[in-house]
Amino acid sequence: MKYNRLGNTGLYVSEICLGTMTFSGQNYFGGVIGTLNQKEATSLIERSLEARVNFIDTANVYSLGESEKMTGQALKDLGVKRSDVVLATKVFGRMAPGPNDIGASRGHIMDSVSLSLERLQTDHIDLYQIHQSDARTEVEETMRALDDLVRQGMIRYVGVSNWEAWKIMKANGIADKRGFARVETMQAYYSLAGRDLEQDLVPMMQDQTIGCLVWSPLSGGYLAGKYTPGGDAKVEPGRRANFDFPPIDKEQADRIVMALRPIAKAHGVSVARVALAWVRQKPFVTSTIIGAKDLSQLNDNLEAVSLTLSPQEIATLDEVSAERPQYPHWMAKRNNATRVPTGEPVKMGGPPPKN
């Protein structure tokens, strides 16, 4: 297990982060993500800690607080020293029917953080993340509230999830101007079947030294191979039969799985492990969040850290999963093709370059 720097902070987190969306499952998507009880959740956390995972991610909205409760109880029951684990949670989702029980307003943030601390049985949250982009709250209001929490010692660092690149830049511009705590991490969907963030978010995160925390690296289990016919896999309905998320191009995803299978066979590992290794080996990824419904699934995912794909294997997967560049990226690439001098004579005029 390697440890990577969390954004521009001095904190280090394991390259694998345990996700807790499978804990409880009550009142959350009808339990289709997972329905682990306290004993089962505790065993997953214990196994993760044994594998030297020091990073756990949850959210107040997961099972309407039950996931946070179970996480906190597990850490207490296991006698985990608080400084040995980096605890991350999130705020935004609807926790009650009232008009202000959702969002990234100062009111909702301040109301929510104390409840999260209570459920987690801790006096501080290491990484407090705004779970979604709020179209109705000014960014400065959100950033001021988060900075107040940092100054009060209730949270240590600020992160966001599912935000647009421009909004993160705006947030940190405000933070720099006002002396607020900056956004240090972005939790984003990324997988072989979902590479959207490479176009805008990745260049921004690399330029600004913002950590990338990846959720759903297997695209809701699709890249485990159990939905794609062929090979030795048995096609199963799985989670996507009831909750078809995140959205993917299933024809392309099937082609990706078909490319994953021979690589997995060559290494003697599961298809899922290869897909996770591809994500983990991307230089901009700080930590990959994995969830599990049982210990066997968790153990297979944890073993991804011991698998290193060759440059040729990565190139093969890059090619089969490539997405068409969006504007203005294709235009910038086209017009920078001859930007770097090669030493060869420059030809002026003539036909335009090919697309």
Sequence positions of predicted segments:
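Generic structural signal for well-ordered alpha-helices
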Residues: 45, 68, 72-75, 113-117, ...
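Conserved, mostly hydrophobic/aromatic
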Residues: 6, 18, 41, 48, ...
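Structural preference for beta-strand elements that scaffold enzyme active sites
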Residues: 13-17, 54-55, 84-88, 124-127, ...
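N-terminal binding-site loop/beta-alpha segment at the start of enzyme catalytic domains
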Residues: 1-85, 151, 355
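Aromatic-lined glycan-binding groove of carbohydrate-active enzymes
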Residues: 197-235, 270
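Glycine/proline-rich, positively charged
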Residues: 26-27, 33, 94-196, 200
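Terminal-tail/helix-coil boundary detector
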Residues: 1-2, 207, 231-266, 281-285, ...
